[in-house]
Amino acid sequence: MASSSKDRIQGVLLSMPTINDEDHNLLLDRQRVHLRWLIDHGFKEGSGVLLIAGGMGEGYFLDDDEWRSLVDLLAGEARGKVATGVGIFELSARRAASKARYAADAGIDCVQMAPPHYLLPNEQEVFDHYRYVNDAADIGIVAYSTPWAMPSPGFEFSQRLLERFATLENMV
């Protein structure tokens, strides 16, 4: 990964809400206004990362076209002004890698990626999921711990797993 993208990931990672109408359709014009407001009022290069389609943005409910629309909006509005990120919530490492490549090609700096969550994965399966995406896409990866989203009792990143993540080139 180009170190310049990884170096841009500094400060607060702000997960933006996804703005919808009452029928759950994206309101991209309003999303754009919100994004511009954040940039105009203090989110600048080095002060933080603007994250779209993350947990707060209900990224796990978006279809692929909606997700791509938000990625394209963020990349277009924030390019050269502030670091950017996008949430990825996929059961399949292959689908997660495809989204990570799309985000990288759009100019996004990092993905905030949750582990696969339908079945309770073990530590090796979670590591393999992140390694697959790391090897497939040239983009920073932020590990997103979501133990509340797992089957009981939940999966939590261990110290050992975090140390293993640190061996992956693209992990932030």
Task: Map each language-model feature to its residues.
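Active-site beta->alpha loop and helix N-cap motifs at the rims of alpha/beta catalytic domains
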Residues: 2-156, 160-162
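Active-site/ligand-binding-proximal alpha/beta "capping" segment
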Residues: 158-172
